[in-house]
C-alpha cells in the first residue's frame, strides 16, 4: 500500500476534542457509528469533505475522544454542522457537557507524494 499524507496542503482539519461518560463508552461508539454510517449524515453529502473523519479514542484516558476529518472549506463544514446540531443525534447524550464543537486547523505542511513514494521504495 502506498504511503499518502494524512492531509493535503491548504486543506483544513476539524478536530473535535471531547469526553464521553465512562459508563456509556460502548453505547456512544455504537450510536456514533449508526449515525455516521447512516444515510442521514449531512457531512457525507458535501463535496467540501475531502477525507471522511476518524473517531479516535485516547489510550491513556478511554473516556477522551477526538474526531478528525479533512475539508477543503471550513465555512461549509460549519454550516453543515448547524444542521447536524438541529438533528440532535443520539450519541450526543453521552458527550460530557453536551459540547461537540470542533477546532479548525489549516494544513500548512504535508509531505509531498514524490517523497513518500521514494520512502516506500526503500521500505520494500
Which residues make up each language-model segment?
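Non-catalytic surface loops within mature trypsin-like serine protease
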Residues: 20-22, 73, 109
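An amphipathic, aromatic/His-enriched active-site/gating alpha helix that lines ligand/cofactor pockets
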Residues: 34-52, 60, 70-107
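Acidic/histidine-enriched, glycine/proline-rich intrinsically disordered or flexible terminal extensions
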Residues: 4-7, 106-124
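Short beta-strand/turn micro-motifs at beta-sheet edges
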Residues: 1-6, 53-57
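Short, surface-exposed ligand-recognition loops at beta-strand->loop->(often short) alpha-helix junctions
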Residues: 19-34
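Active-site-flanking beta-strand signature of metal-NTP-handling nucleotidyl enzymes
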Residues: 11-19, 66
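Short hydrophobic/aromatic beta-strand element in the GNAT-like acyltransferase core
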Residues: 13, 52-53
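A short, glycine/Asx- and small/polar-enriched loop/turn
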Residues: 61-65
